Structure formats: C-alpha cells, structure tokens
Curated annotation (Swiss-Prot):
Residues annotated as domain Protein kinase: 1113-1389
Name of the protein: ALK tyrosine kinase receptor
Disulphide bridges, residue numbers: C694-C707, C788-C799, C903-C921, C980-C988, C983-C997
Feature: compositional bias, Pro residues: 1603-1613
Taxonomic source organism: Danio rerio (Zebrafish)
Cytoplasmic side: 1057-1705
Lineage, top ranks: Eukaryota, Metazoa, Chordata, Craniata, Vertebrata
Encoding gene, per UniProt annotation: alk
GO molecular function: ATP binding; transmembrane receptor protein tyrosine kinase activity
Length: 1705
C-alpha cells in the first residue's frame, strides 16, 4: 500500500504545474500548488484567459478527417450509392465506426487536477466523492455519439473530453493497476451512416477538452492527455452478402461480397529503450556526440537543478508565471502498466534558428531504469538524443538540449524504462524551450480489405492481378468495372486505351503474343503490343489511356504494368494532367533505364504522387528502321491506394526504415521480399543496396520526397540534400566497418534527330574499406535529354520525317543530344570532398552523328585536376573541382553538378543530365566525370560530345575496369565483399543455396565446389533413366481424376433433379386450398421468427400479446374486407379487465397465406397492442392458437373519418349539425394520438382521414388513429427508410419522403397538415385536379395547397407550418396541440360557419369507372337515373323496379353493347348502386356532351371515384376503405328501404367528384343548372329524405352512448359463448379470400376488372342524346399505379390507400 501511495504521489508530480520536492521529502512538501487559473485566489475566470483559451483550443485538438472522395470512389467500386437503400441495390450493407482512446492518460490527468485536499486524503477520489478502493469498481460503458444540426451543416463532429465522459467510458478515474481499463470507446456508427448517405465535404472528428476547463492551465493538460491517449478512429463498411433469387448476367452488377475497413491514427509509435552507450553520469559534466561527417544537430549537457536555477534567472520567472500555457512550455504524460511512463511534446519547428530545450528529471542510485530522450520526425525513425545510465547522485538534474535548425516539424519524447514493478520516474513539468510550436497534424487513413475467408490484406493488394484471398474475391470483374482502363489485361476489350493516330506502326490489342516476341516474351493471354517487323517503318507510336480521376490528396498512388520487348528500342511512359495539357507532359519511365530489357517480362512499379487534376497516361515507342523492334504491355493497374487511402496532410513517405526495427513491433501481415539490415540477427553478408535517380530526370537531382517514395519497401534509407552544393545528393550511413564493393554506372548521353542510339555511360567496380557510421555521399548521374520525340509540333515533325540539318538555319540551333551526367561516390572529411569512385557519363550525340565510339578513359592520380570540359556553342561536361562554367556547360560536383542549358530555346529542350552533363546544340553536349568531356567548338552537327573520364581513389581496389555499357540513367550498387578465401579463384557469389565459387573462362567448378577444372576433363554424365513409367503414372492419375469428377457431377445432377421434383410437389401442395401451413402455427412462429421489436424503448414479442381462447369469441356479422381478410363484429367474454360480454371488431387471417403475411399480421397486432392512449384504437387481444388467426380490436361504431365528413357536409337543402368546434375537437384528438406516437419515437407514415375512426357519429364522438399498415414494415430493417417498389401515399408525404425515402416524426407532421386540410374541406381529396405525378412536381417546386373554403386563418397557418420544406422547421405535435387549443379559445375561429355543399350527395360521389373486358377500351362512369325512364324491351324486372338507367357513351353510331348476364346473389347487401361495364372502341376519340337540362353543380376540383365491393377476375376486391375494419357497411333494413325509395323518387344525379387521370385530368362535365321547376322539386325530395335519415340516426345512436350488447335472444344466452349458439355467419369467406391479395383501388395494366353483375343494357334510343362521363382508355389513375421505376410490382400486403394517393417508388 505504501508503494501505491508513493507511486501515485510521484505521478501527481508529473501533472501538477509546480513540483518543489523529491520523493524523499517530508509530507508537508507533498501538498499541491494552485494552478495558474487560481493564482489570484478566486475561482472566477478571466475573460482574457477564456478568449485566449478558445483560440488555443483550435490548435490543441486531435483531428481526424475522412475525405469525401473516399465515399465517391467506394460507391463507384461497389456499384451502388451509399444511401442505405436496401431494396433497389440487391441487399444492404453494414456500417461500423468507433473511436478508441487509452484510458490511463485521461484518468491520471483528470484525477491530478481535482481538488488537492481530496486527492491527498482519498488518493484518487473523483469530484463526486467516489472512493475507488472501497466501492465496487464501476463498469465502463461504450459512449454513443450523435449529430447535431450544426454538425450536419459542417460535416464535423466535435468530441469534448471531460471528467464525466472519462468516468462513464473508463469506469471511474482510478487506474486499477492489476487490470486497468485499456480503452475508452465511443460509437460513431450513426454518424458514419448519416455521412455516407449525405452530401458535402469530408467528415471531420475533432477531440478537444470540454468547455468548463477553459482555464489555460487546465486546458493545456487536458489537451496533452488527449494527445497522449493515442486516439484511433476505426471504420468498417461491408456488404450483407444476402443471396439473390435471380442471377444477373449484367457485368455492371455490384459485387455480392465486399468488406473494407480503415483506421485513422498517428503512425508515430513510441520506441523501446535500446542499450545505452552513454558514459556521462557525473555531475556538471558536459558531453557532445558528433559523429564523423555529421553537422552537429544537437548537443546536451547534464547539470544539477540548483546550479541551473541559480545561473538562469529566467527559469525562476517562468516558474512563477501566471500566464498558464506559454510558448516554450509543454507537458504530455502517458503511462501504461505494460510500457512504462513517457512524456510527449507537441509539434515544434526550428526553421530559421537553433532552439534549446530544458528537461528536469529526478535521479536516484537505486533506479535501475533509464531516462531516454527521443527526437521524432515523421519521415525518419526516432533518434535517441540521450540516455542516462545508473546515477551516482541523488536529486534533481536539468538536461539541456541544443537543437540545430530543422526544416521539418519534430517532437520530443522522453521515456523511462521500467524493469521492476516498484520503479518510479519523476519529471518536473517545467519544461522550457524556445522552439516554435505547431498545431497538431492530421492523421493518416489506411485501408484494409477483408477476404471472404477471413484473411485481411492491404488495399494495395486489391485488384493487382495477383490473387491474395483464399477464394479469389480480391480480383475479378468488379476490379475491371471500377474505373475504365485502370485494371486492364487487354483481353476482351482495350479498356479505353486508344492508339494515337500517326504514321508508322500502331499499338494494337493482340489476342496472343506477336511472332517477333514469342521467343523472348512468352504469354498465354492477350496483351497490348506494337510490332515494327515491316521494313521502312519508323517514327514514334503512342497509345493513350482514358482520362482517370485524380487520387485522394496525398494518396500513396502507384501505377504497375508488365513490359517486355526489344533491348534496342525505346519505350517510355508519360503522364499529362488535364489542367496543363500536352505542354506539361512529364516522363515517368523509360525502358532504356531498365537493365536486361530484352530478357523476358519485367514488372514496373512507378509512384504517382501530387496529382490534383484529371490525368491520362501515354505509352510512347520510338521505332527506327534499322531493325525489327517490338514491345508488349500487359496487366496494367492503378493501385487501389490511389482511391481508398490517404496520408493526411503529409505527402506519402517511405516506410519505417531498417534502423527503426529496434523500436517498433513487426506486423505479421506485411510481406517483405528483402532482408533489411539493422534488425536483430540481420547479417550484411547477403545485403545489397541499390541507389538510383529516384525518378528524377533532366538537369536537377531528386528531392527528398521523390527518394522517400522511390525507396519505399526497400532497404535503402538515405537523406537527400535540399540546399547549396549538396542539393539532390543522397547521403547514406555505413552500417558497419568492413570492405564494401561499390559499382558505379554513369548516365548515357542523349539521342539526336538522326542518331537513335545513345552514347553509353561508363560503369566500373571497386572495393573500399568503410568505417561504421561513416557518411557516404552519392550523386547518381542522369541521362542527357533526347532531341526526339519532341512536344513542339514543328520539332516533332522534323523528328518523324528524319530531316537533314540543312533545311532551316534558324532551326539548326539544336537537334543534338545532351551530355550524360557522371556518377560520383565521395566522402566529406572536415569540409573537404574526397572522391572514391567516379563513373563517367556519355557525351551527347550530334544532329547527324558520324563520330566513332571513343574508348574509356580513367584517372587514378588525385593530383590531376578535375576540370570542366571545353564549351563551344554546345556545353562541355562538368568536372570534379572547377569554377562555374558558361550556362550551357555542366557544373562541377563541388558546385552542385547540375546539367547545362541548351544553346537556344527553339523548342529543342536538350539539357545536360544531372551530374555535370553539358547542354546540347546542333552538336552534342559533353559528358560529366572526373574531367568533363569537351563539346565541339564550331557546332558541327556531325560531332558528338566527348565522354567524361572515370576515377578510382588510390584507397580503393579495382575490381572491374571501366566499360561503356550504360544506356540510361546512372546507378550505384553497394554490397559487402564476400569472404571467398576458400575458393581456388578467390571469387564467389551468393545464391539461394549458399556461397558458390567463380571460375575463369574455359574452367568449370569441380564437384567439390572449391577448385576449378578444365571442362574437357569432366566425365561423361550417365544417361538419364526412361520416363515412360512417369508418363504412365500421370496418364493413370489423370484418368482417375476425370472419372471421379464425372461421377461427382452426375451425383450432383441426380440430387438436383430429385430436389427439384420434391420442391415442385411441395409448391403444388402449398398452393392447394386444403393445405394447412404448419409453419404458421404459434410454436413454429416462435421457433422460426420469434419477432422482438422495440416500441418506445420497450421490447415487445408475441408472448406479450393477450391470448383469448377461441371458445370465448363469437362472430355476429360481417363488417367488410380488411388488409388481410374479412373483418367481423363479434362478442368476446372472459377477458380479464374487460366487460363481459364485450363488443369487438375481429380481424382475421385466412388459413392459406404466406409466411410474410403471418409476420405482417403479428406485426400489426404487436404495434397496436403496445399503444395505450385514448386516441389510438385499442387492441383487446389475439387468438393465435387456432386457425384462422384473430385480432380483437375495440369496436368503433362511427366509421372512418373521411366517410363521416362527406356524409355530414352542410348542404343547401340539408344543414349539418357539425360546427367549427367539432372539427377542431377531431383535429385535437388526432394530434393527441400523434403526440403520443412522437413521444414513443414511433413513425406512423400514413396519417390521413381514411385511417382515423370515430367512436360514434353523434355528439361526444372521439377520433382515434386506427390503421398502422404502413408502419409495420419499418421494423424489418435497421433504417427508417422506405425503399423499393412500394405503394406510397404521395399526397400525404413530404418531399424528403417520396424523393429520398426518409421517414421521421416530421413526416407525420406534414401528413397531419394534409389531414387538417381534409377535415376543414369536409372530406375532399387533397391537391384537387392534380395527379400523383403533378403533385410530386408541385410540392418539390415549393407549391402548397390553398386553404379550404371558410377555413380560419390560424388553422391554415398550422397547415402551412406543417408543410415547411425543411423537416426541422416543422413544429412538433406538442406545439400543434397548443395552437389548436388557442384556436378553440378564439371566438373568431370557432364562430366561422362551415361551407355549404351544392354538389351531389355522398352516395353519388362514390361512383367508380369500371374497366371493360377489352383493356384498351375506355372506362365508363355510371350513375343512377331515377326520373327519366329509358324504354327498352330487354329490361329485367329488377331493373324496372329499381328505376335505374345507364348513361351511355355516344362514341359511335355503330357501337353495340353486348348483353351482360343478370346479377348474382351476394351474401351481403351493399349500399352502392349497381354499375355495369361496356366495351367501347379505343380507336375513336373521346367526346363529351353536356345536358343543360340535368342541372346540378359539378365540382371539377374534387372529383372522386371508389371501386365497388365486387371481386374482380383475379379475386381482388375492388372496394376497400379502411384496412382496420374493412368496408363500413351496415345492414340496416330501414336505411336500405329508404335508399330504394330514394332511387324511385330522385331525379338524375351527376357525380360531383370526378376521376383524376394519369398525367392530366380528363373530366366530362354535365351542363350546369336545371330548370327552376325541376330544381325545386328535387330540393323538396332531398329535404324530406334527409329528415327521415336524421330521425333514424337519432333513434339508432342517440347521444353517442357507450356501446352495449344487442338485446338478448329469446333463449337465455349462456355466459360462455360459442359460435354454434348464434345465428350462422358465412365464415366460408375466411377461406375465399387468399391472404394478401387485396386491391387498393387500382389494377395492373392489362388486367381488366371483373364486369359487375347487373341488368342487361337496353339499346340506345334513336336520336336520343345521353349524358356521358368518359375517362381515358388506359384506365383511371386509381386503377393502375404511377410508375416511377421501370416495371410494375403490386405488393398485396401493403395497406389500403384510397383514391389517388398511391405511387410506386
């Protein structure tokens, strides 16, 4: 326990702003000092400090950024948008995102900043009084983060880290050393889901301290702890891999499986302590570490703290400063039970001047660990600046570091190795530095691909023509379909690569290798090739790629391709960005730089960094007529790193260098192909270092970034100079002392117009003894620039036509080749350059070169001055040590070695290569070397530039003499000299089998592997044995394998046929009406599905439903057909908590239905059962133990709201009892129900008058929400998004719902606004005279409905507020209820009279156009005619009795109507007037005829139609009003008699609400007005009929009293009811209606409706004109869906929707 307390106190010292004592001081000194925020003794924050803190918070946060282009490229790869639409794109995908932070730094930082007394008394008590040692350890929780409206606008999530977050996520503030909580985890899945489907910029996640710690002293430490917590952002997006019922042959179909993950983190890791070699342990002893050849970058000294404070008074002032954070002070503390404590600084910069750093540590002789201070740069491994050995003194020591100026940002890390458990380390937080601070940098984003078999690979291994996944899902068609041309094997197509038209040979995609390349480039497949076998073809042939998208910013993008061809030709790859055009074309690669070009296929990998615009690539082949030249390119790829990875704010860098292997852990998933020097157990015997130009071309050398990228995944680690004479020179540190073999290759000279061959550079090899840590300087020569091909059209024409030099004197200033640069290997000792090995560069070729190849020249005497070559019009080559030459001359190495300029800027950009190459004119430029080559003085086009001279130091031993043979850029190869003393020749080389001795020519290695013998002395080899037995074995094995495969295939086919037959029989059995689906039993449902859903935070399942025994339920009469089956009125007894008997409405599910119908039926029961509100229809119980299944609902005698509003409209002859207060009360009831749903986070999605029910029609009525048909499918997926081809109520939906499929509680707000419009228009259809398509365009363009007639202004304002375009601008239902209450209290609102209806009665509004037998024939709207009798001999008696007539369409005088069979008996009587259909020829134009004598008012704005209750040909009922109770018809004998009497006495009626058409409304209006006498008679009849109806309703309903059971029958009714005790009910209808096949007021195109059974039609009277009402031949809109997507899908399980409110999305 004492050790724990001591450990805590010492750690507290690392966090507190003041530390005045060591661990051995008294307890008085252990009290903490006040922070800088409370120096003045008050808790009030200074406004200036707060303002400063807010500014600094921007620089102290950790910043994660996910580029928006990543979202685009991922969607392009998977061939589907990332919008959560699961139905349109063959399945969903899963998303996961979380943020991890280490808990220990956060816990210790926050605990150290709490109240000092509490911290001293309770060790680690939190601010809330938590005692971690005495109470049970809290359980850490995963924190869920959401998006605010501000975050949605900025695509930025700000995570404020504070005390409460750490307590919750880490389980308290105490660190349990035995089992610490490692990570604080935050779930960002919802944020990622939103961002993937949204638009806008990148997703940004920023970590910063919470606002209440804005005191500068506290905020600094919080920010430091956040940085030290090593935050990491994990993202994973994967396909759900759901099986598809159909197999698509479309190649552009999205891949079935894909799984990507990313991790965003700072790649810097903190190293372990190496074995220290420092011996500076004495007090006040100064030590300097200055390796040979290094500029002193740092120095450090170790002094006592007392002496330092006594001398430096500024540090004392810093200690007492009250400014909190200052430039020059930092502290970041992190600790782990596994790795020990360490501190980390922010990013610093010392760009212009050196800076210093003071670190205070506590030393004790008993410490076995060591303090180590590291210098960390992003592009380099951590460098140990100092390491303390076992100290011999006790006390505080100040370590002072002096850092040289550095161009790149860096950090300082100090760590302490902790061998023992009781080891402690103490740091004084008073670090001081004058280095400039930098803000935190963005982190990198690295991607991984998860194979189907579970293996993970890097993104770079995806789509690279190399199968790395076990099942091969990392390659294939989805890679080829990603970006055209980026993944091409030139097999089936050219992938968009097009040849550039020109003379000479052309690039072509060949199905097989050309004849000229078959011997050297064997290939079984197709490829892109060029062949110049026909004589006389010469010039340049280009092939160009498609235009590629630019990669992500700072992406590690690579281009890879395989190439094979002739060694005497030239193939190059160029890149052109769209913004620069052909003038900015850059060369990426040239085949002349590749060794062994003509010896098989070679894989070329090139970096593509820094691209910010669209670009294309171009292969260019230079063809001469001297010999046949052929090239082939295959398997071209752009790495997926280009589009799925980014390096953050930094350009791509080389991987961790070999020396850093001491500090970082190895990754088993990274495959290496070379053995890196510097790791544990590594040996230099087999290591080879290859240095090249890093991709640089021309007269200037490479940059550090180029070399970092070029040496990626290699064992080469160099530093590249950026200033002065060392610019472009590579510096390499010798790993150990031994003899090395150095091979230097000079660069070749450039080609001229007529000379197609380069002047070769010189290569030579020497052995040198090098010392460990010695710095070797390497300048790799670059080839001189070629005159051809040329980007200038005029010059390029000269190149193609091979013109001579005398055509134009102004163009003679050029055409020669630039001189090649020499390759230099040298050392710098005490500022003096010492050459070791110099390989000369080749001279440039003259315009029409006729020079002979010169011999190699080498210098060995260092006393010979290394002068520049002589320059004429063309420049001479640069030497070793000379003065500055003319501009066209190459510069000597001492001055930088840059190449010379061309003689004149006439478009001949033939500069000398880096390494002293001379610039060309008509004559060639001189080559670089120890002594530069001279150029011809009179610019003779026939003269080449001279080669430079080579050199080897006397300290070296020549191994290979100079030889001209390099036809490209230079190169340097360094490898350790092998110990070949055991070989007779003294020479050997290493192979995979070990060391192999060399032998001279005509000698052969003896069998002993050591000596060399004459090849003629070798004994004859014994004859090889016959291979007949091997061939026989192979043939037998092959035959057996083929036979096994045939048997296996046959077995599979037989099993498949058997299974197919069984499936067919099962399907036939399932389709049989006598089949009882056993899966629909309750036990099977629970086993297969067991649906569990969440309602308002509560989990619900089928077990929660109240089961009512079937014997307690009796059905009395039918109410109609619902969404699943018949709906009945019944009685239920024995239900706990309910009256007995109780009137209920029973919804049934037929026995023969699908599993999905069963699940939908249970879903609706679950939804309704979990709601308990006075304005929502109550579920009494269910009966699932027997078939058919029942749902028992409370009986609503008032019917649906829409029908009630239509029936009670005030009319001129019949005033209504409704008032404005009644309408407001109905609206308030529905709003209360919606508020309840909103509070329980439930989305109804279909708030409309047809889905609301009334308890009664008289006063005291209560409105309730009664249909949840559209709400039940929101629980089948994880997203509140309606997708696929579903029927949607467009006129009740906001724009985001029908455009994007997004449903929220604000969707119901919009629908409630439309419901208000329905209520105050008294049941009219919204958006009058507009079709669904017109409504889509109208609402999307900002249009809204006008207020209904006599609608009060405050009510219309509620509507308009509910119709706001932005969902967040719409009010919630609490606000809507308040506004409705205000309206009820406003006299100006409640006293507004209702509008008077002048149209027809509701029964006549419900007429529906019936479809004829011919689908192309127009539908007829049929209405009754009571007063006008049409004479006909074919009328039936029933037709005459009912007094009905038919309004016929006068389309043609020759049209004849076929007879219709008489009406069939129906088990239920309906209130609808019988209608008939008649086919009408569709070829004739529709015409309209108005009858002025009929009179009446035609409301063209609100024309409606409803289907009849009959069944159509496909067994789909054509009239369904409300799916909760079905069709509301009441078998009231008095009302039927009244209707019959009305038909006999009423006059002709014209429908008041017509039919909306698809695309546009075609209505036929009758003439307005009747004769006055006929009108008065009609009014009187209607008034009498209305009075009779009022009396009957009052007698039947009274004042809306509670529902009571009907009078008992004469026989006594038993308490336990049974269906047998009541009158028989036609229950056969439960089997007649198949589950789910319910029509919704429409028919599919081409499926005519069943003709209605009615009286036979009479022939038209000659000359008689009849009123007509026509619709289009294609059918009304309610008889077919509006097609938004191609194809028509009618879902039989969708909820019923009335009128024209359905569309297919």
């Amino acid at each position: 326990m004492i050790a724990r307390i001591l450990y805590f106190f010492l750690w507290s010292a690392a966090f507190l702003p003041e530390l005045q004592c060591a661990s051995q001081r008294t307890a008085d000194a252990l009290t903490t000092f006040p922070t800088s925020a409370f120096i003045n003794g008050t808790d009030r924050k200074d406004s200036n400090q707060t303002s400063t803190s807010r500014i600094k918070r921007k620089t102290l946060s950790v910043d994660f950024a996910v580029p928006s282009l990543l979202r685009y490229y991922l969607a392009l790869f998977i061939k589907r948008p990332l919008n959560g639409d699961c139905l349109s794109f063959n399945g969903c995908y899963t998303v996961r995102a979380n943020l991890l932070m280490r808990c220990v730094p956060l816990q210790k930082t926050i605990a150290g900043l709490l109240d000092a007394k509490l911290a001293a008394m309770n060790v680690n008590r939190s601010s809330t009084g938590q005692l971690p040692y005495r109470q049970k350890r809290p359980v850490p929780k995963v924190l869920n983060l959401g998006l605010t409206s501000a975050s949605r606008k900025s695509n930025q999530v700000v995570v404020e880290v504070g005390e409460e977050m750490v307590k919750t996520g880490c389980g308290g503030l105490h660190v349990y050393e035995d089992a610490p909580v490692v990570f604080l985890e935050m779930d960002l899945t919802r944020i990622l889901e939103w961002w993937l489907g949204a638009e806008g910029g990148r997703l940004r996640v920023r970590l910063m301290p919470e606002r209440k710690v804005q005191v500068p002293g506290k905020e600094d430490k919080y920010s430091a702890a956040i940085r030290a917590s090593d935050a990491r952002l994990f993202i994973q997006i994967a396909s759900s891999e759901r099986p598809s019922s159909t197999i698509s042959r479309n190649p552009t179909v999205a891949p079935k499986y894909w799984n990507f993950s990313w991790i965003a983190e700072d790649e810097l890791t903190f190293p372990e302590d190496p074995v220290s070699t420092s011996d500076c342990t004495s007090k006040a002893k100064s030590c300097d570490r200055r390796p040979d050849g290094y500029y002193p970058e740092f120095a450090w000294s170790l002094t006592s703290a007392e002496d330092s404070w006594a001398i430096d008074q500024t540090m004392v002032k810093t200690k007492a400063s009250s400014q909190g954070w200052e430039e020059g002070r930092f502290l970041t503390v992190n600790s782990s039970a596994l790795t020990g404590p360490w501190v980390l600084s922010p990013w610093f910069r010392a760009a212009h001047r050196p800076c210093g750093l003071d670190i205070t540590v506590f030393l004790h002789p008993r410490q076995s660990g060591r303090y180590t201070v590291w210098l960390i740069e992003r592009d380099k491994p951590p460098l140990a600046l100092l390491t303390t050995e076992h100290p011999h003194v006790i006390g505080w020591a100040v370590v002072h570091l002096s850092l040289a100026a550095r161009s790149k940002p860096f950090r300082i890390s100090s760590s302490y190795s902790q061998p023992g458990e009781i080891e402690t380390a103490t740091y004084d937080p008073r670090y001081s530095t004058n280095c400039t601070t930098r803000s935190s940098q963005n982190v990198t984003l690295r991607g991984r691909y998860h194979c189907r078999g579970g293996r993970e690979i890097n993104v770079s291994q995806l789509c690279d023509f190399s199968i790395d996944c076990p099942q091969g899902d990392d390659e294939g068609e989805h890679c080829r379909q990603f970006l055209n041309g980026s993944y091409c094997s030139f097999g089936r197509e050219d992938c968009g690569w097009q040849p550039v038209q020109g003379r000479g040979p052309q690039w072509r995609a060949h199905p097989s290798i050309p004849q000229s390349l078959r011997s050297s480039c064997p290939s079984p497949g197709a490829l892109l090739a060029i062949d110049s076998q026909p004589k006389g073809q010469r010039g340049s042939a280009q092939v160009r790629s498609p235009l590629f998208f630019y990669p992500l910013r700072n992406a590690p993008c690579m281009v890879k391709f395989w190439v094979c061809g002739s060694s005497n030709g030239a193939l190059s790859l160029w890149i052109t960005e769209n913004s620069t055009g052909p003038e900015g074309q850059r060369s990426l690669w040239n085949s002349t730089s590749e060794a062994n070009m003509g010896k098989g296929w070679k894989l070329i990998t090139l970096p593509l960094f820094g691209l910010v615009d669209l670009f294309y690539l171009q292969f260019s082949a230079d063809i001469s007529s001297s010999s046949g030249i052929a090239f082939a390119v295959d398997n071209f790829t752009l790495s997926m790193e280009c589009f799925l990875e980014t390096n953050g704010e930094f350009p791509p860098v080389a991987p961790i260098s070999p020396t850093q292997a001491l500090f970082t852990q190895s990754n088993e998933n990274i495959k290496t192909t070379t053995t890196l020097y510097g790791g544990p157990g590594a040996s230099t015997e087999s290591v080879k270092w290859i240095f090249h130009t890093c991709g640089a071309t021309g007269q200037d050398g490479p940059t550090p970034t180029q070399c970092s990228n070029s040496y990626r995944n290699t064992n080469v680690n160099v530093t590249v100079g950026t200033k002065g004479p060392f610019k472009g020179i590579q510096m390499w540190q010798v790993p150990e002392t031994r003899k090395y073999r150095i091979t230097a290759y000079g660069a070749a000279g450039g080609r001229s117009v007529l000379a197609v061959h380069k002047s070769h550079g010189v290569y030579m090899t020497g052995d040198f003894l090098l010392q460990k840590d010695e710095l070797l300087y390497i300048l790799v020569g670059q080839e001189g620039e070629d005159a051809c091909p040329n980007m200038v059209p005029t010059m390029d024409r000269i190149c193609r036509e091979q013109q001579g030099p005398s055509i134009n004197k102004t163009q003679l200033k050029g055409g020669g080749g630039g001189g090649g640069g020499g390759t230099y290997v040298f050392k710098v000792v005490n500022g003096v350059h010492i050459p070791l090995l110099i390989a000369a560069g080749g001279g440039g070729r003259g315009y029409s070169s006729q020079s002979e190849t010169p011999e190699e020249v080498m210098d060995r005497d260092p006393s010979i001055p290394g002068r520049n070559g002589k320059s004429g019009t063309a420049g001479g080559g640069g030497g070793w040590n000379d003065s500055a030459p003319v501009p066209q001359g190459g510069r000597p190495l001492i001055l930088g070695g840059q190449g010379g300029e061309p003689c004149q800027a006439m478009g001949w950009k033939t500069r000398g290569g880096f390494g002293g190459g001379g610039g060309a004119c008509t004559a060639g430029g001189g080559g670089g070397g120890y002594r530069g080559g001279s150029a011809w003085h009179d610019n003779d086009p026939r003269k080449d530039g001279d080669d430079g001279t080579s050199y080897i130091s006397p300290d070296g031993e020549m191994y290979l003499e100079p030889l001209k043979g390099m036809e490209g850029n230079g190169e340097v190869i360094i490898n350790p000299v092998q110990n070949c003393s055991h070989c007779e020749s003294g020479d050997c080389h290493e192979t995979s089998e070990g060391m192999v001795c060399y032998c001279d020519e005509e000698l052969t290695l003896a069998p002993d592997g050591v000596s060399c013998i004459n090849s003629t002395e070798l004994p004859l080899l014994p004859a090889q044995p016959s291979l007949s037995h091997l061939a026989l074995g192979l043939s037998v094995g092959t035959s057996a394998l083929i036979a096994a495969l045939l048997l296996a295939v046959s077995g599979v086919m037989i099993m498949y046929r058997r299974k197919h037959t069984e499936l067919q029989s099962i399907q036939l059995e399932l389709q049989s009406p006598d089949c009882k689906l056993s899966k629909l039993r309750a036990s099977t449902i629970m086993t297969d599905y067991n649906p569990n859903y969440c309602f308002g935070g509560k989990t619900a399942s089928v077990n929660d439903l109240k089961e009512v025994p079937r014997r307690n339920i009796s059905l009395t009469r039918g109410l109609g057909h619902g969404a699943f089956g018949e709906v009945y009125e019944g009685l239920a007894v024995g239900i706990p908590g309910e009256p007995s008997p109780m009137q209920v409405a029973v919804k049934t599910l037929p026995e023969v239905c699908s599993e999905q119908d069963e699940l939908d039926f249970l879903m609706e029961a679950l939804i309704i059962s979990k709601f308990s509100h006075q304005n929502i229809v109550r579920c009494i119980g269910v009966s699932l133990q027997a078939l058919p299944h029942f749902i028992l609902l409370e009986l609503m005698a008032g019917g649906d709201l829409k029908s009630f509003l239509r029936e009670t409209r005030p009319r001129l002859e019949h005033p209504s009892s409704l008032t404005m207060v009644d309408l407001l009360n109905i609206a308030r009831d529905i709003a209360r129900g919606c508020q309840y749903l909103e509070e329980n986070q439930f989305i109804h999605r279909d708030i409309a008058a047809r889905n609301c029910l009334l308890t009664c029609k008289g006063p005291g009525r209560v409105a309730k929400i009664g249909d949840f048909g559209m709400a039940r499918d929101i629980y089948r997926a994880s997203y509140y998004r309606k997708g696929g081809r579903a029927m949607l109520p467009v006129k009740w939906m906001p724009p985001e719902a029908f455009m994007e499929g997004i449903f929220t509680s604000k969707t119901d707000t919009w629908s409630f606004g439309v419901l208000l419009w329905e209520i105050f228009s008294l049941g009219y259809m919204p958006y009058p005279s507009r079709s669904n398509q017109e409504v889509l365009e109208f609402v999307t363009n900002g249009g809204r409905m006008d207020p209904p007639k006599n609608c009060p202004g405050p009510v219309y304002r509620i509507m308009t507020q509910s119709w706001q375009h932005q969902p967040e601008d719409r009010p919630n239902f609490s606000t809507i209820l308040e506004r409705i209450d205000y309206c009820l209290q406003d006299p100006d609102v409640v006293n507004v009279p209702l509008p008077v209806e002048y149209g027809p009665i509701p029964e006549e509004e419900e007429r529906v156009p019936m479809r004829p037998e011919d689908p192309s024939a127009p539908s007829l709207l049929v209405s009754p005619q009571g007063t006008e009798d049409v004479p006909s001999a074919t009328h039936s008696a029933q037709s005459k009795k009912d007094g009905e007539a038919i309004h016929m369409a006068n389309l043609s005088t020759d049209s004849k109507l076929p007879p219709v069979p008489p009406s069939q008996p129906h088990p239920h009587h309906h209130l609808q007037t019988p209608v008939v259909t008649a086919p009408v020829p569709a070829s004739k134009p529709s015409s309209t005829t108005s009858n002025a004598q009929d009179g009446g008012h035609v409301n063209l704005g609100f024309m409606q139609a409803h289907s009849s209750e009959k069944e159509s040909r496909n067994r789909k009922p054509t009239n369904l009003w409300n799916p909760t109770y079905g069709s509301w018809f009441l078998q009231q004998q008095q009302k039927r008699q009244q209707v019959q009497a009305q038909r006999q006495t009423s006059g002709p009626r014209i429908p008041g609400e017509g039919q909306e058409q698809v695309g546009r409304t075609v209505t036929v209006a009758e003439a307005l007005g009747l004769q006055q006498q006929h009108k008065q008679q009609q009014y009187q009849q209607q008034l009498q009929r209305q009075q009779q109806q009022q009396q009957q309703q009052q007698q039947q309903q009274g004042l809306c009293r509670p529902l009571l059971p009907p009078p008992p029958p004469p026989a006594p009714t038993p308490l336990l009811l049974d269906s047998a005790t009541l009158a028989p009910v036609p229950l056969y209808r439960l089997r007649r209606f198949p589950c789910g096949n319910i029509g919704y007021g429409y028919q599919e195109q081409g499926l005519p409706m069943e003709p209605m059974q009615g009286p036979q039609l009479p022939p038209p009277h000659p000359g008689q004109q009849r009123p007509i009402s026509l619709t289009r031949a294609s059918g009304p809109e309610d008889s077919r869906p509006l097609l938004v997507t191609m194809g028509t899908v009618q879902d039989s399980r969708l909820p019923k929707m009335e009128g024209h409110n359905a569309t297919v999305l």
